[in-house]
């Protein structure tokens, strides 16, 4: 099957959603599908000094990446959506459009393309334009399925009467299979100390406040190793701890 994956993730970047998108495209390709990933051409937001996008994300180069125009201005998302529309209009050699970008998935149905929409969160604002687009999307005969990452999220959409049960597929987030459990990474600090790891973003609400508050209460033979975060957040916590 030929799949066009529509994303609004900045690639390359440090965001979790960009990692998810790249891993999903690799997984589709690993299962024998021909995949093209559409992503915004937002050079001002790219992670700097990345020579190879695929290598940066630790994925195989078994799918293509196509960057589409997305100006860094108010309303840029509308222009990006139009860029997706015209790309799909010109490039018709695919069987399915899949993605997490609601606007892009919706315009794909306007061109009579079969679509699968993936979402990781409920639609909270019932009066927003996203709500209108979503309702139009799910009424389209070209809408085939919505993928959610938990049964709880599926229940929210069912309770609100958006879709029938058969139209929502639960597919929990996964991870690559670990091939070598004995592989060790050399970390800073003493080899004899207990090493506690944290991976993820460092902005408020992700857990760094808890780590910072308990750091000076731990025994000296306990080390905390933090991996992740944007440069501004790394700088903030380095100055604070």
Give the positions of each predicted feature.
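A short, active-site helix/loop in glycosyltransferases that binds the activated sugar's phosphate group
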Residues: 107, 140-168, 172-180
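N-terminal strand-loop element at the rim of the active site
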Residues: 5-15, 27-79, 229-233
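An amphipathic, basic-hydrophobic alpha-helix
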Residues: 51-97, 106-110, 130-137
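Short His-centered aromatic/hydrophobic patch
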Residues: 98-104, 119
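Nucleotide-sugar donor phosphate/pyrophosphate-binding loop at the beta->alpha transition
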Residues: 75-83, 111-114, 119-142, 155, ...
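Conserved donor-binding/catalytic core segment of Leloir-type glycosyltransferases
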Residues: 4, 147, 188-215, 219, ...
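Acidic anion/phosphate-binding donor-loop and adjacent secondary structure
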Residues: 125-129, 158-159, 167-193, 204-207
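Glycosyltransferase donor-sugar binding loop
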Residues: 41, 199, 223-237
């Amino acid at each position: 099957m030929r799949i066009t994956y529509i994303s609004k993730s900045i690639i390359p970047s440090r965001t979790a959603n960009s990692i998810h998108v790249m891993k999903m495209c690799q997984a589709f390709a690993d299962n024998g599908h021909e995949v093209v990933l559409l992503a915004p051409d937002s050079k001002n937001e790219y992670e700097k000094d990345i020579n190879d996008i695929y290598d940066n994300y630790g994925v195989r180069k078994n799918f293509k990446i196509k960057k589409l125009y997305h100006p860094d201005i108010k309303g840029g998302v509308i222009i990006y959506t139009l860029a997706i529309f015209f790309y799909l209009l010109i490039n018709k050699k695919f069987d399915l459009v899949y993605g997490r970008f609601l606007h892009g998935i919706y315009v794909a149905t306007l061109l009579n393309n079969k679509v699968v929409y993936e979402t990781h969160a409920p639609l909270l604002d019932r009066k927003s334009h996203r709500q209108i687009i979503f309702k139009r999307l799910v009424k389209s005969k070209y809408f085939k399925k919505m993928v959610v990452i938990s049964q709880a999220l599926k229940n929210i959409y069912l309770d609100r009467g958006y879709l029938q049960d058969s139209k929502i597929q639960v597919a929990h987030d996964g991870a690559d299979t670990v091939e070598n459990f004995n592989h060790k990474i050399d970390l800073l600090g003493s080899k004899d100390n207990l090493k506690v790891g944290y991976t993820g973003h460092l902005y408020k609400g992700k857990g760094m406040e808890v780590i910072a508050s308990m750091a000076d209460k731990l025994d000296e033979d306990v080390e905390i190793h933090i991996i992740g975060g944007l440069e501004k957040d790394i700088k903030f916590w380095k100055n604070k701890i």
